[in-house]
Structures are given as structure tokens and as C-alpha cells.
């Protein structure tokens, strides 16, 4: 494995949720400890539960791992860190500023950027503690800061003075006010990250087109700010032996090999390792030790793993329920790569096929959806908005209005603030909201939705409500986009996830965030499930068994309505395949 050769003191793993960062970081830590190195493993992944992996309690203080001599671990809870961080900023102003101002500030500090910055605050303590490198040869982190966070930390000028003069404009600069450590410490931490003698960054991906494109963007973004010592690990690759006697396994293998042969050009030059798909979840030292093997695990015979099929309705049953209202807004929500665009297209095609008037609006960057579907069904209209164009338009508007009075340092801060994920969400939602009102007469299906945090920022603790109420007078009837989304009679939010631990946890967090904004998801779609796919591959059957607890947890803990969609042998593009998916 190339990424394991001549490892510097700090090793960071980065990649989207569910690609295997924590498993690979744990396996790496074990491998190094077995070589006689003293290793500290730092986990900030809320889904990881490193303690469960090693069968012992791990907390916010360094604990020796009993089962692996030489290995210690530490868990940083990013949500708890963010909560303490918020309290540091908000508690001193409670009772001093009006309640609505405090509430607005609290909301600015409730997004992903705050969690990210609070976690980096904790990282900084570890990266700048010289005594740790006398106790440990390697410190391994199972997540890495984003380029956006590092750029914010690199920017000159006082964050707090910028925030004081722009209280209503800062979505990601608000959190900077709570940074406790000295600027020199952050500068040292960023310098340590950029030094190839001290830090190696491992990008973790699966062989899926969207995941690889996302990793390529991360690679470029981090390289541009000096983090150039990067390696690529492709995890969960199906062994060729599984493809021999099974149609589905053969199709998956071919799809993955094609993705491997056509890696994004930006990734082609990186030292790359591949890890095989494992039959069981990575819990316990023996399972983790096998993960870094260059040989696939021998599978049992397929008869040993007869499939237990979960009793959960198909997507068509969910669409039949949706159709009863005869019109309405259908919004699909979920993390990147879970299949929102495909699910939205399948729902729209099925509704149109049932005779309803449907407008499918997509932010699919590939634009293949609009090309495949447009004009194919008489009562299906397809429109596409370009997230990059909309974001750029929104950024220019903010820079021309709020940026007008700022000095150069202030403008640079505002420009970086406008690179936050919240900005794209707001811009895309504003573009989508142009068609939302059509949902009173027909079905409007959207393949993306803003988070609860973004909606609350947009709604600014009801300021939008009050402004419209003032204009309409007491007797006027009015509806803001927020009110429309909060009305279950008119809007159905569907969460899309995968039957794996991290994607389910991420979807549950999205649901909790929407509920803070008074929006209750109507149902969940669990996509890409092996548990209801037809396969004789022993490895895929074993993986199907691993899905069952996750599917059960969605059904019991998170959703009143669930649909299960199988892994498909070929990509569902075109009317006929989409009809099959939701038919």
C-alpha cells in the first residue's frame, strides 16, 4: 500500500460520509502499532464509534487501547464541541441584546460551518501540542478540515470587527468570533497541515462517478491552499471472482472497472491504492487487520447466506400515496451521491405516466436528466437550474450590495464567507422558489432541498414573515416559501439515504435539522439496497445481511413511511428504466 509508506507524523483521512474513512484510519493505526510505532487515533466522526470498534469506552481524554499495544485513541464529539462553542459566544449576550437578535445569532452558529470550525479548534490544540509528538510517533485523524475552513483561518484581519459591522450578513464568519486560541496557533496549525514532512492527506473514495468527481474537487481545493502531499485510496472494490456466476455482481464489477479506468484527470497523478469490499462490517481488530490486505477475502458458498428480504414497500407504493393529493410540492433531500436526482426523476415520470401534470426541476450538474426526459412525456416539463450560475449571480448581488462599504480586508472575508455551502443552498433555493407556487395546480418535483439551518437563515427568525405581514395588512392572506414548506398538505419532503450506518445517521441529522425549522419529512427512500436485489454472489449476499439493522432502524426510529429501492445492474436513465424503478 503506497499510502502506508514513510508516513509522516500527522495523517488525515478525508472523503464523504460512508466511504470508509474511520475503518481505514483504524486499520492504519493497528498496522502502525503492530510495527512497533506509538500511535494516537483521533476520531471526530459522529457515526464512527471507535470505542465500539475496539470494544472499550473512549472519550475526550486519551485512552490506551487494551487490545492493541502501542495504540491510544481519543474521540472528539463535533456536536458537543459546536454546542460549547455556541455557548461561549451566545451566553454573554443573553439578557443584554433583544431576544430576536440572540435567536438570530444562535441560528447563524447552528450550521455545518460552526461544527467544522469547532472541530478545527480541537484539531489545533492537538497540532500545536509539541508534547504529543514526544509521546507518539504518529497522530491519525479520521476526518480532515475542508478547504473553506482553512481559507477562513488563513485570512488576515479581525473576524470579530467584520461581524460587528455585518451582523445580518455573516453565515460562516459568525462562528469565527468564538475562536479561543491565539492567531499564532491557527497559523502554526495551517502551516503543519501544509508541510509534507509533517502531514499526509489521504483522500478516500468509492468507485462511483459522483464520489470520484467530489474527491477530485477536494483534491484541487486543498492543493490550492498548500496541502499537496495527497494520496488516493479507493475503498470497497468488488473482487473479479464475485462477477463470475452472477449477473448483478458482473454488472457492478464492470461499472466499477470502467470508473477506475476513467478516473477524473485531476486524480490520475496521485499515488493510488485500492481496497477490496469486505463481507462484514469493520468491528474488531481481526476484521480491521484484513482490510488493508491486497488479497480479497474468501467468500463462503452463497447457500450459507440465504437472503432475508425486509418487508418494506417499493417506490411505486410511495408514489401512489403521493398521487392521492393530485398536486403538490415534492422535495427530495439527502447527502451527495445517494441518488436524489434519479429518485426525483423516477417519481416525476411515474406521476406523469399516471396522467398528472408534472414539473420536474433539477440541479443535476450533468444535465443528462433534462436531455433524456425533456419532451418524452406530454404532461412532463423538465427544467434545470445550474447551481454554479445561480451561486455566482447571488454572490455578485451580495458583493455589490453588502460589500459596497467594506475595505479590502472586509471584502476578502465576505468573498470567503460566500464560498460556504450555505451560499449555494440559498442561491439554489431562491431559484427553485420561482416555481414552488406552481405546486397549487400541479406536481412540482425537486431533486434538492435546503437544510433546516439554511431555511432558518433565510427566514431570519420570521423577519420575512413580518415584512410580508406589514405590506399585506392584518386582513391580507399571504404565504412565504417557508410557510409552504411547513404545510404537510402542500409539501412532502422525502429523505433519500443508503442502507449503511453513516448515510442513515446523516439523513437522521438532516431530519432533525428540518424539524427545527418546523418541517417534518413525509417519508424516507432507502436507495441501492442489496437486500432486495437478485444476486447469487456470496459476498453481495453477506453485504445484504449487513444492511438489515440499518433498514430496521430507519423503519423503527426515523420514518413513518419508507420505500426500499434495489441496487440495479444498469444506470436507470431514460423513460423506460425510470418507469421500471417506480412502476
From Swiss-Prot:
MF GO annotations: ATP binding; ATP hydrolysis activity; ATPase-coupled arsenite transmembrane transporter activity
UniProt entry keywords in alphabetical sequence: Arsenical resistance, ATP-binding, Nucleotide-binding, Plasmid, Translocase
Kinase in keyword set: no
Enzyme class: translocase
Domain of life: Bacteria
Cysteine pairings via disulfide bonds: none
Gene3D superfamilies reported for this sequence: P-loop containing nucleotide triphosphate hydrolases
EC numbers: 7.3.2.7
Binding locations of ATP: 15-22, 334-341
Catalytic activity, reaction form: arsenite(in) + ATP + H2O = arsenite(out) + ADP + phosphate + H(+)
SMART domains: AAA
Residue ranges of coiled coil: none
Function: Anion-transporting ATPase. Catalyzes the extrusion of the oxyanions arsenite, antimonite and arsenate. Maintenance of a low intracellular concentration of oxyanion produces resistance to the toxic agents.
Family per record: Belongs to the arsA ATPase family.
Protein's recorded name: Arsenical pump-driving ATPase
Source species: Escherichia coli
Lineage of origin: Bacteria, Pseudomonadati, Pseudomonadota, Gammaproteobacteria, Enterobacterales
Amino acid at each position: 500500500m503506497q499510502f502506508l509508506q514513510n508516513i509522516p507524523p500527522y495523517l488525515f483521512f478525508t472523503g464523504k460520509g460512508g466511504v470508509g474513512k474511520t475503518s481505514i484510519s483504524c486499520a492504519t493505526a493497528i498496522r502502525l502499532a503492530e510495527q512497533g510505532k506509538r500511535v494516537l487515533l483521533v476520531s471526530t466522526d459522529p457515526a464512527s464509534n471507535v470505542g465500539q470498534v475496539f470494544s472499550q469506552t473512549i472519550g475526550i481524554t486519551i485512552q490506551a487501547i487494551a487490545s492493541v499495544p502501542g495504540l491510544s485513541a481519543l474521540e472528539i464529539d463535533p456536536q458537543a464541541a459546536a454546542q460549547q462553542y455556541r455557548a461561549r459566544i451566545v451566553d454573554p449576550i443573553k439578557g443584554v441584546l433583544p431576544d430576536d437578535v440572540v435567536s438570530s445569532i444562535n441560528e447563524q452558529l447552528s450550521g455545518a460551518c460552526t461544527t467544522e470550525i469547532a472541530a478545527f479548534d480541537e484539531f489545533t490544540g492537538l497540532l500545536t501540542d509539541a508534547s504529543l509528538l514526544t509521546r507518539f510517533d504518529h497522530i491519525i485523524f479520521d476526518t480532515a478540515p475542508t478547504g473553506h475552513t482553512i481559507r477562513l483561518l488563513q485570512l488576515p484581519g479581525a473576524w470579530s470587527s467584520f461581524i460587528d459591522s455585518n451582523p445580518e450578513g455573516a453565515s460562516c464568519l459568525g462562528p469565527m468570533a468564538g475562536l479561543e486560541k491565539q492567531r499564532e496557533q491557527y497559523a502554526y496549525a495551517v502551516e503543519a497541515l501544509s508541510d509534507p514532512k509533517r502531514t499526509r492527506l489521504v483522500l478516500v473514495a468509492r468507485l462511483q462517478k459522483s464520489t470520484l468527481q467530489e474527491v477530485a474537487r477536494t483534491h484541487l481545493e486543498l492543493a490550492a491552499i498548500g496541502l499537496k502531499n495527497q494520496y488516493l485510496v479507493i475503498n470497497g472494490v468488488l473482487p473479479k471472482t464475485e462477477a463470475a456466476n452472477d449477473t448483478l455482481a458482473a454488472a457492478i464489477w464492470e461499472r466499477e472497472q470502467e470508473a477506475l479506468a476513467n478516473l477524473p484527470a485531476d486524480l490520475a497523478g496521485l499515488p493510488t491504492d485500492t481496497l477490496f469490499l469486505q463481507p462484514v462490517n469493520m468491528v474488531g481488530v481481526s476484521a480491521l487487520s484484513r482490510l488493508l490486505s491486497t488479497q480479497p477475502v474468501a467468500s463462503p458458498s452463497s447457500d450459507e447466506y440465504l437472503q432475508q428480504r425486509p418487508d418494506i414497500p417499493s417506490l411505486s407504493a410511495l408514489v401512489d400515496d403521493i398521487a392521492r393529493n393530485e398536486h403538490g410540492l415534492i422535495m427530495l433531500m439527502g447527502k451527495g451521491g445517494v441518488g436524489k436526482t434519479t429518485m426525483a426523476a423516477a417519481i416525476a415520470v411515474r406521476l406523469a405516466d399516471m396522467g398528472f401534470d408534472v414539473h420536474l426541476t433539477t440541479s443535476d450538474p450533468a444535465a443528462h436528466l433534462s436531455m433524456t426526459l425533456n419532451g418524452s412525456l406530454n404532461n412532463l416539463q423538465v427544467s434545470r437550474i445550474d447551481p454554479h450560475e445561480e451561486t455566482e449571480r447571488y454572490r455578485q448581488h451580495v458583493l455589490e450590495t453588502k460589500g459596497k462599504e467594506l475595505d479590502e480586508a472586509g471584502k476578502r472575508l465576505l468573498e470567503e464567507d460566500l464560498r460556504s455551502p450555505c451560499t449555494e443552498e440559498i442561491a439554489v433555493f431562491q431559484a427553485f422558489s420561482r416555481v414552488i407556487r406552481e405546486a397549487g395546480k400541479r406536481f412540482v418535483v425537486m431533486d434538492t432541498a435546503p437544510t433546516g439551518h439554511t431555511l432558518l437563515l433565510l427566514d431570519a427568525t420570521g423577519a420575512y414573515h413580518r415584512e410580508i405581514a406589514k405590506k399585506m395588512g392584518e386582513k391580507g392572506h399571504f404565504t412565504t416559501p417557508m410557510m409552504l414548506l411547513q404545510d404537510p398538505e402542500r409539501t412532502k419532503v422525502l429523505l433519500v439515504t443508503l442502507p449503511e450506518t453513516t448515510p442513515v445517521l446523516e439523513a437522521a441529522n438532516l431530519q432533525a435539522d428540518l424539524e427545527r425549522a418546523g418541517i417534518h419529512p413525509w417519508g424516507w427512500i432507502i436507495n441501492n439496497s442489496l437486500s432486495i436485489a437478485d444476486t447469487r454472489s456470496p459476498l453481495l449476499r453477506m453485504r445484504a445481511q449487513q444492511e438489515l439493522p440499518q433498514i430496521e432502524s430507519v423503519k423503527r426510529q426515523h420514518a413513518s413511511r419508507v420505500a426500499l429501492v434495489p441496487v440495479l445492474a444498469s444506470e436507470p436513465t431514460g423513460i423506460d428504466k425510470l418507469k421500471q424503478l417506480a412502476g
